[in-house]
Amino acid sequence: GSDGWTHSLRAKGRKVGAPFADWKVWPNTLRAHQLLRFAPREKEAQLKKACFEAIYELGENVSDPETICRIASENGVDVEGFRKVLDTPAAQQDVRRACAQASQRGVRGVPYFVVSGREDARPVGFSGAVDAPQLVEIFGEVL
């Protein structure tokens, strides 16, 4: 977690005071996505924030069943119901299908943003940590 592509992420984070953890593992997020698909829609933003904090700021392994169930519980999700569907073929296939659809739309990472504006300008999609000058450039292209 502290080398490769995370190096630029950490560098950008330091500039804006992002408290990135000293990552020991880089978790597979399949179970986190299962949680997001299971939970009520009104919990989605709260759960995304909790998962991002767990991964990036606390260095937790959200691929661990107990960790993702704890996050569910702390955020008011029916943990017993979630445990019943966690890792079922149907739940895994649902996430894989959603990921395939996102990939077809050009999503390559999270978070992912789409900025649109003028009718004559094509929407611009981008993912990950983007600094202010890059955002200004993107907005200039579409607004």
Annotate each language-model stretch with its function.
Residues 1-58:
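Structural alpha/beta surface segment adjacent to cysteine/selenocysteine redox centers
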